[in-house]
Structure formats: structure tokens, C-alpha cells
Regions:
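Active-site diphosphate/adenylate-binding microenvironment
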Residues: 1-47
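Catalytic-loop motifs flanking and including active-site residues across diverse enzymes
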Residues: 2-6, 50-54, 135, 139
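Glycine-rich phosphate/diphosphate-binding loops that line cofactor/substrate pockets in enzymes
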Residues: 17-19, 61-62, 177-178
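Short coil/turn segments at beta-strand junctions that form active-site/ligand-binding loops
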Residues: 21-23, 65-66, 93, 180-182
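General beta-strand structural signal in soluble alpha/beta enzymes
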Residues: 21-27, 69-70, 96-99, 151-154
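Thiamine diphosphate
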Residues: 31-105, 168-172
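Glycine-rich ThDP/TPP pyrophosphate-binding loop and its adjacent helix/strand module
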Residues: 78-95, 99, 103-228
Length: 228
């Protein structure tokens, strides 16, 4: 899958911005939790869905620190939706990275908040349909509508050019925090070949041809340029 690429991008941005030694990561439950094994920053593990609640406490206790969360879409936008939205509404000076792979990856491929219409999962064996399961949530757009949000973007890891764009967006989200402007958010479209039961190549095709048709990449809010 693309989690290794996402972790590398976060690590590169922190290193290039000179923030590594001053950073605290708050992780939650899911595939994303292992980031602390691969990135050399202080970290704290939160209960499922509570990464931004924990990060809020850390940032308020240590406002001089760079604080970020790294979560999956199920963690960020399902069990942790209240914590995520209210951190943005409060304008917490935190950077949040959310990996959207349209499923619960670690627990076996169940339907999640971003599962596409028609997508078959272990808990939607006939495919997601609106009467039973509702619509997939468009996270970046919702976060952008919060007054406390300084930066909200959606990027993809399906190709080298898009990986470069993803790194730029991650940097912007950290810059929003460093400038004290408010909440910074990046939603990253990522493949999950195992639970999608696809080869990595086919999984990247799905990201491009299906996910990006519903979850449009782009910057949905950016006030960093007006506050240099």
C-alpha cells in the first residue's frame, strides 16, 4: 500500500523544515499507528478516534512544540469525527494527516465512512448503497468549512507527479501551524491492495479512475498565502 510513501513524505517535510527535534506525533488505532516505528519524533498513542483530542492537550500544554496527528479515514471521520471536526472548529494549531483508502484496513476491510457507492466490503457484501449505508463523506471539504481551518487539501499517491503535489500540501499544512494560523489538514488518497484484493498496479488504477472521480484532489482552503 501507500502508507510507506505517506510516512516518508511527512518525515521529509519535518526534516526540511527543521522541525524534527521539536515535534510530537499523536497516533490512533489503525494501520497508521505504526508511524512511530519509522519516524524519529516523540509520539503518543491515543485511543481509537481520539488522536486530535490528545493532540489538543499536548499542544495546549506545550504550545512551542510542532504537533501532528496521523490517522486513517475510519479513525478520523467515523469514530473520531467529533474530535476531528471540533479541533478544526476551535482552530487548534495542529497539523492533521488523514489516509483515505475507503476501508478499514487493519481490521479486515469493513465498510468505512469513505467507502464508495457500490464498493463491496466485508460488511457491505452487496456493495455500499444509500438506503442502508448513506453516502461517503468528503472529508477535506467538511474541514475546509470550519472557520478555524487555515489549510485543507486533498492529494493522491497514485503517481509520481501527484506524490510531489502531496508533499507540497503536507508542507503547507505544517506551515499553517508554524505561522499560528489555525488547523492544517491534508487528506491523502491511498491504495489498499490487500483488502481491495488487487495487485498494487490495479489498486493505483482504482485510485485514479474511481476514487479521484468522487474525491477530487485540490486545495479547498488556504489562508497561509495571506499571512506570510
Amino acid at each position: 500500500c501507500d502508507l510507506g510513501v505517506a510516512v516518508r513524505l511527512v518525515a521529509e517535510v519535518l526534516d526540511e523544515m527543521g522541525l524534527t527535534e521539536n515535534t510530537i506525533a499523536a497516533t490512533s488505532i489503525g494501520c497508521s499507528v505504526t508511524i512511530y516505528d519509522f519516524i524519529n519524533v516523540d509520539s503518543i498513542e491515543a485511543p481509537h478516534g481520539r488522536a486530535l483530542a490528545v493532540a489538543t492537550g499536548v499542544k495546549r500544554a506545550k504550545p512551542e512544540k510542532c504537533v501532528f496527528t496521523y490517522s486513517g479515514d475510519g479513525d478520523f471521520a467515523s469514530i473520531g469525527l467529533a474530535e476531528s471536526m471540533h479541533a478544526a472548529l476551535r482552530g487548534e494549531k495542529i497539523t492533521a494527516i488523514c489516509i483515505n483508502n475507503t476501508t478499514y484496513g487493519m481490521t479486515g476491510g469493513q465498510l468505512g465512512p469513505t467507502t464508495l457507492l457500490g464498493q463491496v466490503t466485508t460488511t457491505s457484501p452487496t456493495g455500499r448503497n444509500v438506503p442502508y449505508y448513506g453516502y461517503p463523506i468528503k472529508i477535506a471539504e467538511h474541514i475546509a468549512m470550519c472557520d478555524g481551518t487555515a489549510y485543507s487539501a486533498r492529494v493522491s499517491l497514485d503517481s509520481v507527479p501527484n506524490i510531489r503535489k502531496a508533499k507540497q500540501a503536507i508542507r503547507k499544512a505544517f506551515e499553517a501551524q508554524e505561522k499560528g494560523l489555525g488547523f492544517g489538514f491534508v487528506e491523502i488518497l491511498s491504495s489498499c491492495p490487500t483488502n481491495w484484493r488487487m495487485t498494487p498496479e490495479k489498486a493505483h488504477d482504482r485510485v485514479k479512475n474511481e476514487m479521484m472521480e468522487v474525491f477530487k484532489p485540490g486545495v479547498y482552503k488556504d489562508i497561509t498565502e495571506n499571512n506570510n
